[in-house]
Amino acid sequence: AKCIEVSQRVRWDIERDVIRGRRFDFDQKFLPDGLSRVPDLAFLRPAEARFLSQIQGRTYANMFALVERFIGAKVIELSRDHGLGDQVAFEALVRLTDEELKHQALFRRLDAMAAAGMPEGYRFVPEPNVVASAVLAKSTWAVLGLVLDIELFSQAHYRSSIAPDPDLSALWKDVFLFHWKEESQHAIVDELEWRRCDATLTAEERERGVDDLIALVADVDGTVQLQARADADYFLRCAGRAFSAAEQDAVHDTLKKAYRWQYIVTGVQEPRFAEVLQALVTPGQLDRIGRALAPIVAHVAS
């Protein structure tokens, strides 16, 4: 009921409340240094560093549009469990789905606005419907674990990196302020649904859910590596000067680290996610998940 009350109070419109007739200021960064890892590339000139943050910001919007495709589909599926039962839960899930559809429209709008001020040749490689179909083929328990991870890291990114950075595009910051307002309620609903799903499982079903969650993390890692390569190639083509082989390798590795950090590590290290996961799985299962994540975490820290 609290989530519904807040949803009603913070509800916003894309054009009226967020965009407000503005355009992106391409003299400013989009993604903050704490997420982009751009300062690790000390050989970049200021304009190049800013451009790389804008590329990452455009991908950040597209990644959220992608994940909200399968989040909305899964949540509307879950709402059927409550349609003739708990009407408060039913309304909360329907509202969440409606907001996720709005967020997809917002992020499509951002991509078009970014395209207007960036060189041609940018590609968002993953196909949202293909990715969503693959995710939704996994067990509901695993999908809900991934969804909670995403909802929590999106909030953490805003609080710790986007909101405090004075050098970001004002429009960019507003986008993620309004996004954060609604995502804060989504995480609460997602956690309740994950716990509800978990309570229905046998030990064998939960073990399969852990297998699926590990597989989903590997799929996410493959997706972000694919986009990191595309974005690094785009940057190197459009930066306006030649880079040494070592510098090109550094750009590729930094983007791979940045995307693993943004879309995997910040989520699994979020205290609330760790707390919920630990409450649902056995120590052995938690260890298996940790071992699957270890190479990714080690690469990000290197």
Residue ranges and their predicted role:
Residues 80-84, 98, 102, 109-116, ...:
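Alpha-helix capping at helix-to-loop junctions
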Residues 160-225:
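Aromatic-anchored, glycine/proline-accented short structural segments
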Residues 1-91, 112-128, 134-141, 201-302:
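Terminal targeting/low-complexity segments that flank the catalytic cores of oxidoreductases
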Residues 64-72, 96-111, 144-158, 179-190, ...:
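Alpha-helical transition-metal enzyme core signature, strongest for iron centers
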Residues 128-180, 184:
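Loop-centered beta-sheet repeat module
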